[in-house]
Regions:
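Beta/coil-rich, acidic/histidine-enriched accessory regions frequently appended to metallopeptidases
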Residues: 1-165
Length: 165
């Protein structure tokens, strides 16, 4: 995507510490990468698509600047699913751009309602009450890192990945 940056630009090893309660188990891990982030925003029409064809460069400010990510998928003993997705960016400004774009996606593209701040820890919490994305989300910006927790319910956010403080 950015050939002039390689090999000079280092990648980050994004890690996700397991902070789930005994009712949840990690069932898989993967990296999504800049292309997946671009397509996520493109599908929700947050990236310009003048001819409705994705630009082959995949370059956009909402996804540029990613240096590493890790998604850990979880399943509960009752069969519910969720994930923790940590993204690391070149700078706090790049992280803020992705963070703010993701919050816009939750609010305006998939109908998320912002909840009051949680007493349990930092991060903005959203709930999508119906539709294909019906779930709860906690999105935390910390310097050059954005962590997204997805669970079937608001309570599930805390049991799947307890806030770090």
């Amino acid at each position: 995507i950015h050939p002039v940056r390689y090999p000079a630009t280092a990648t980050a090893n994004a890690t996700v510490t397991d902070r789930s309660t005994p009712g949840w188990s990690a069932v898989g891990t993967n990296r999504l990468g800049e292309t997946t982030i671009h397509v996520m925003f493109w599908l929700e029409r947050m990236v310009p698509r003048p001819d409705d064809a994705i630009r082959t460069s995949y370059e956009h400010p909402l996804s540029a600047g990613l240096v590493g990510d890790r998604l850990v998928a979880y399943e509960s003993v009752t069969g519910q699913q969720g994930y923790v997705w940590r993204t690391v960016w070149e700078s706090p400004a790049e992280a803020r751009e992705f963070h703010d774009g993701y919050l816009r996606l939750l609010r305006f593209r998939v109908g998320g309602d912002r909840l009051a701040p949680a007493a349990e820890g930092p991060g903005k919490r959203y709930v999508i009450r119906s539709g294909p994305f019906a779930d709860a989300f906690r999105v935390r910006l910390d310097g050059d890192t954005v962590t997204i927790v997805n669970a079937p319910s608001v309570d599930g956010l805390e049991t799947l990945h307890a806030p770090s403080g």
